[in-house]
Amino acid sequence: MSFETTAITFFIILLICLICILLLLVVFLYKCFQGRKGKETKKVPCTDANGGVDCAAAKVVTSNPEDHERILMQVMNLNVPMRPGILVQRQSKEVLATPLENRRDMEAEEENQINEKQEPENAGETGQEEDDGLQKIHTSVTRTPSVVESQKRPLKGVTFSREVIVVDLGNEYPTPRSYTREHKERK
């Protein structure tokens, strides 16, 4: 094969690729403009207290029934302050405002629920342990102290720190959950 035939073959392959890219671009633009022209536009009635002077809902234009739900959510959330994109959040005022007795009652209810869940599991077991004189002791699962915590002095050049992660689980669980995680860093 000569240089000319190789160059012509390369040029033809390059031309075919370019034509395919242009065809994909034309199809994409056609779909975009077809979607804009086919939509029906309706004005959303204003529900502002000022009679619609500064109503953001009147400026919103709906196009499809599917979009109506999304725009309705935007209109409903106009007065909601922006939340930071960080997982760590402060506790809500409701949680801070609850008296200490209510918190203790809530904790006692949670413990009762845990104990109720454990009792049916143990009810199915045979009574051999009671016959032998042994007692069943319900112990809560706690973290055992690690070797590092039991040492009197820390290792040289190692820093231990405790990190608290607070996760907001949304509307389903209104109180944020916090988890502690320990890690060590070498200097």
Swiss-Prot record:
Question: Where do Polar residues bias regions lie?
Answer: 137-149
Q: Which domain of life is it from?
A: Eukaryota
Give the UniProt entry's GO cellular component terms: membrane
Where primarily located?
A: membrane
Keywords tagged on the record: Membrane, Transmembrane, Transmembrane helix
Pfam family of this protein, just one? Answer: DUF4642
Question: Membrane-crossing residues?
Answer: 8-28
List the subcellular locations: Membrane
Membrane topology of the entry: Single-pass membrane protein
Matching InterPro entries: DUF4642 (IPR027813)
Q: Where is this region: Disordered?
A: 99-153
The entry's protein name is Uncharacterized protein C2orf74
User: What species is given as this protein's source?
Assistant: Homo sapiens
Gene symbol?
C2orf74
